[in-house]
From Swiss-Prot:
Family affiliation: Belongs to the DltC family.
GO molecular function: D-alanyl carrier activity
Pfam (any one): PP-binding
Pathway recorded for this protein: Cell wall biogenesis; lipoteichoic acid biosynthesis
Name the UniProt record assigns to this protein: D-alanyl carrier protein
Compartment(s): Cytoplasm
Entry PTM: 4'-phosphopantetheine is transferred from CoA to a specific serine of apo-DCP.
InterPro entries associated with the record: ACP-like_sf, DltC, PP-bd_ACP
Species annotation: Streptococcus gordonii (strain Challis / ATCC 35105 / BCRC 15272 / CH1 / DL1 / V288)
Broad class of the protein's primary localization: cytoplasm
Residues with the O-(pantetheine 4'-phosphoryl)serine modification: S35
């Protein structure tokens, strides 16, 4: 499974929300993510992709859409 498909699956599993049709929509504004959800998402991303997301790199504006999450995970996997 590619990064995009897996990120979509993780968001769906955690938040019961299919974001495949809203990849560029702000997930906070859409009510998908909140502060607790963000923590859950980071933990799951770290476990599934064997990455570490530094707090300094997880700004809301940098990871607020599914596409930005995919980009962030991809960058951390390639680091």
């Amino acid at each position: 499974m590619d990064v995009k498909a897996e990120v979509i699956e993780i968001i769906d599993e955690l938040f019961m929300e299919d974001v495949s049709d809203m990849m560029d929509e702000d997930l906070f504004d859409a009510g998908v993510l909140d502060s607790m959800g963000t923590v859950e998402l980071i933990v799951e991303l770290e476990n599934r992709f064997d990455i570490r997301v530094p707090v300094s790199e997880f700004g809301r504006d940098d990871w607020n859409t599914a596409n930005k999450i995919v980009e962030g995970v991809t960058e951390l996997r390639n680091a």
